[in-house]
Amino acid sequence: MDSEIAADYSPMLIIYKSGRIERLVGETTVPPSSNPQNGVVSKDVVYSPDNNLSLRIYLPEKAATAETEASVKLPLLVYFHGGGFLVETAFSPTYHTFLTAAVSASDCVAVSVDYRRAPEHPIPTSYDDSWTALKWVFSHIAGSGSEDWLNKHADFSKVFLAGDSAGANITHHMTMKAAKDKLSPESLNESGISGIILVHPYFWSKTPVDDKETTDVAIRTWIESVWTLASPNSKDGSDDPFINVVQSESVDLSGLGCGKVLVMVAEKDALVRQGWGYWEKLGKSRWNGEVLDVVETKGEGHVFHLRDPNSEKAHELVHRFAGFIKGDK
């Protein structure tokens, strides 16, 4: 019967013996809005017709309604949502609320990328889709792409990538690949990316990254099981370099293709030491970036700002996030 459970990954999803997958979170969607929300308008655009994949673009209303002939050029944020590679979308109320707040606070253009999720589409599909989206975004660099908002308003000398949890993991890998594959013309820089923001990044390893990381068997087993479901073909499990970015000696961060990095961690997040470890490893590498910051929110857990976006600490996170994009000191 369809009600027979094969695997229970609550609170994320349930897999039934029939093969049906029931996602328990992140399936509700909200439409984009041409009516300003917090001073921001949005619309959805297809970036991969072959796979029927879209992204949501956010633009400050004042830029959208500017009557001057000279287009208003703004920093460009490309955002990858979290959800363990398993749940959530770029169109959920959670991410629509966050991106609207971030764009309002930072006065930027934002592209929120939707990608195919595991287990139906295991790793590396999410990376492949994200790369396709990033290339689509950069097709507008000369002002002649298919999307007018990017042609008119995106300043490609100020491109920022960001994401939370699994989206932060994707952000890291896209930035490495952008430098390696020379995403941008050399007239800007080879990667085309000015900076990245990793919010509560989902990195992991079979053994603790330091003596402060949790050794709780249940917690470690759960985190590893999420990765195993997302990437069943990883021969090294959670020591796969896709997830074991911090501890793995095979991962060289010196090639990170950006000049500025902000790592945001939360004190009570099981992933907190991975975020600190990334910051430390990058700082000790031969990376030639200019800015490397880490911010820890005390007393809060994983993606607390998405669960309670109206809290004071969530507002502080958005303020710091936006300040990094604006170049605030």
Curated annotation (Swiss-Prot):
User: PROSITE patterns this protein is in?
Assistant: LIPASE_GDXG_SER
Catalytic residue positions: 165, 269, 302
Q: Which reaction does it catalyse?
A: a carboxylic ester + H2O = an alcohol + a carboxylate + H(+)
Q: Which GO terms describe its cellular component?
A: cytosol
Record keyword DNA-binding present? no
* InterPro entries noted in UniProt: AB_hydrolase_3 (IPR013094), AB_hydrolase_fold (IPR029058), Carboxylest/Gibb_receptor (IPR050466), Lipase_GDXG_put_SER_AS (IPR033140)
- Asked if the keyword Acetylation belongs to this entry, the reply reads yes
- How is expression of this protein distributed across tissues? Expressed in flowers.
GO molecular function terms attached to this record: carboxylesterase activity
EC assignment: the record states: 3.1.1.1
Q: Which residues carry this modification: N-acetylmethionine?
A: 1
Main function: Carboxylesterase acting on esters with varying acyl chain length.
Instruction: State the protein's name.
Output: Probable carboxylesterase 13
**What organism does the record attribute this protein to?**
Arabidopsis thaliana (Mouse-ear cress)
Report which gene this protein is encoded by.
CXE13
